[in-house]
């Protein structure tokens, strides 16, 4: 049965809203690239499997970054996959560096850009050194905000800079995606940024931005709520407020509340089933509990008739061996 939302929209608007054309183009490209493998299973089965994987959120695994970030659904799916794959890090209380979290991201998306990981880490670390250790939950919620709302935050950074320089907020020019790449995020070390900007004025600018920024923008009412208890704020203080706001996390819908972050019985059962299918892996994990904290640099691959559709590559990264730590942030 069709949902009321579907019936209220013309066909072309609904297809555009759900990015159906993006998935059709991707499916056809994969069909053509792997037609010899797919011919033995049938085209109808291929499309069934492909769109089932889209619905389940597994279609983004081991894909190129341009596809992972192509639609809101892809971004939510990637966030959920990262959480479910590596929540053991948080469950065991391990603290990792930015470079180590980036290695984990590259296990799911080999060409994941380092810049995005650095920006997410900066939200947690603020003015601390970038080689400090972070808890899994702190990094995950900061990464969620940075990754899902990336374009919106680039525009917010430009607005913040303009307010710091004393420009009239009514004449703020929001950069395009191309021009925004050349503007640097505000540095917390500057004399002006320590005092921040007036929260009410900042929100007025963000409200206007949200009206125009339909693709990737947190609900304005929740943004206002996040700023309601402060008179002035810094740019990274604003990002930290977004990352800790329960309502924004629930509106995005990718991750559970912080208190439930380490609980996923269905995934635990599925992981046990998959691990049992990999010869030698269960014994090695049992013999060395610490080994389960982080994935191997060369994880075993489980064969699948559809696996050629995902272009996985080996990635490697090394920790800088830092021993500094950051405490778990309070909710």
Swiss-Prot record:
Residues 1-225 are annotated as: Required for interaction with TPGS1, LRRC49, and TTLL1. The modification Phosphoserine is found at residue 319. It is found in: Cytoplasm, Cytoskeleton, Microtubule organizing center, Centrosome, Centriolar satellite; Cytoplasm, Cytoskeleton. Residues 1-111 are annotated as: Required for interaction with PCM1. Residues 112-331 are annotated as: Required for interaction with TPGS2. Residues 318-331 have a biased composition (Acidic residues). The keyword Phosphoprotein applies. Keywords: Cytoplasm, Cytoskeleton, Microtubule, Phosphoprotein. GO terms for biological process: regulation of protein complex stability. The keyword Signal does not apply. InterPro entries: CSTPP1. Belongs to the CSTPP1 family. Interacts with PCM1. Interacts with TTLL1, TPGS1, TPGS2 and LRRC49; the interactions link CSTPP1 to the complex TPGC. Binds to alpha-tubulin. This is Centriolar satellite-associated tubulin polyglutamylase complex regulator 1. It comes from Homo sapiens.
């Amino acid at each position: 049965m069709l949902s009321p939302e579907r019936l209220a929209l013309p066909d072309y608007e609904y297809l555009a809203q759900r990015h159906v054309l993006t998935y059709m183009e991707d499916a056809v490209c994969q069909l053509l690239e792997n037609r010899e493998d797919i011919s033995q299973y049938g085209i109808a089965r291929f499309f069934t499997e492909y769109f089932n994987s889209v619905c389940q959120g597994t279609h983004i695994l081991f894909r190129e970054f341009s596809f992972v970030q192509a639609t809101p659904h892809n971004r939510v799916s990637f966030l959920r996959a990262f959480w479910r794959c590596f929540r053991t890090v948080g469950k065991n209380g391990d603290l990792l560096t930015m470079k180590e979290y980036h290695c984990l991201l590259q296990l799911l998306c080999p060409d994941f850009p380092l810049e995005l990981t650095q920006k997410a880490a900066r939200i947690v670390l603020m003015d601390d050194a970038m080689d400090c250790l972070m808890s899994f939950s702190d990094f995950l919620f900061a990464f969620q905000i940075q990754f899902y709302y990336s374009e919106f935050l680039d525009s917010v950074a430009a607005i913040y800079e303009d307010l710091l320089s004393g420009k009239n907020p009514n004449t703020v020019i929001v950069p395009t995606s191309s021009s925004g790449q050349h503007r640097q995020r505000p540095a917390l070390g500057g004399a002006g940024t320590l005092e921040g900007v007036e929260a009410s004025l900042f929100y007025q600018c963000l409200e206007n931005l949200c009206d125009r920024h339909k693709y990737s923008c947190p609900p304005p009412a929740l943004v206002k709520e996040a700023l309601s208890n402060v008179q002035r704020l810094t740019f990274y203080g604003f990002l930290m407020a977004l990352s800790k706001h329960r309502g924004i996390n629930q509106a995005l819908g990718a991750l559970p509340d912080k208190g439930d972050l380490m609980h996923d019985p269905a995934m635990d059962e599925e992981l046990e089933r998959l691990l049992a299918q990999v010869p030698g892996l269960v014994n090695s994990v049992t013999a060395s509990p610490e080994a389960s904290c982080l994935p191997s640099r060369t994880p075993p691959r489980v064969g699948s008739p559809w696996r050629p559709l995902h272009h996985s590559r080996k990635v490697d990264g090394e920790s800088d061996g830092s021993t500094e730590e950051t405490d778990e942030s309070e909710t």
